[in-house]
């Protein structure tokens, strides 16, 4: 993995929004963010789709743009869309060009989501989350923390303790078996990334959980601008899980955090 210093960034740099951000008094109390349920008891369930094979990234962007517009207009339901992509890098709105170490390795897409550079590829479960926050809570920080909670509960199904960090969006796994860092702190690896965008309080983009990707592909970037911590996956942690196993766990955890879903 690349080495270097961690650049300081706002704790919610993974957000890109043109919706007003409501100040929250709960910012330092993530436990309050554990649930992000619809306000109406009879709210329709969230549509849940799983794509087969590898999904072209530009096609995924076009689909999300159209769906977000339809959700805003009230002609489509909220949606969570699970996909895998061919190998590629994406750059968020905070990406530093110096963090793209090998620009010719894979296709690079500039995207409107928050955050910096990340990798997508086979063996990684990407969940695109298109929810109307007006139906839930107009609180961006609460939404991001709820996405983290969703990942944490998914990992718990495999007895993995995922942790959030105030200064680093995403979910992390402590690696006590690895050498400590130069400052004596415990090694931590990132197992899941978050990068979202809001358009008039409808979210898109989402989360990415490493199930069994080729972790060497992260070597072409400084993932999320963080160089002293590495990346890991469920299989890298010694778990013989499949993408199907993760999808089941994601579904159950989603209902716990966000409410009912409708599968096909």
Swiss-Prot record:
Keywords: Acyltransferase, Cytoplasm, Transferase. The keyword Cell wall biogenesis/degradation does not apply. InterPro entries: aa-tRNA-synth_II/BPL/LPL (IPR045864), BPL_LPL_catalytic (IPR004143), Octanoyltransferase (IPR000544), Octanoyltransferase_CS (IPR020605). It is found in: Cytoplasm. Belongs to the LipB family. This is Octanoyltransferase. The active site is at 224 (acyl-thioester intermediate). Gene3D superfamilies: Bira Bifunctional Protein, Domain 2 (3.30.930.10). It catalyses: octanoyl-[ACP] + L-lysyl-[protein] = N(6)-octanoyl-L-lysyl-[protein] + holo-[ACP] + H(+). CDD domains: LipB. Residues 74-262 form the BPL/LPL catalytic domain. Substrate binds at residues 113-120, 193-195, 206-208. Its main location: cytoplasm. PROSITE patterns: BPL_LPL_CATALYTIC (PS51733), LIPB (PS01313). HAMAP family: LipB (MF_00013).
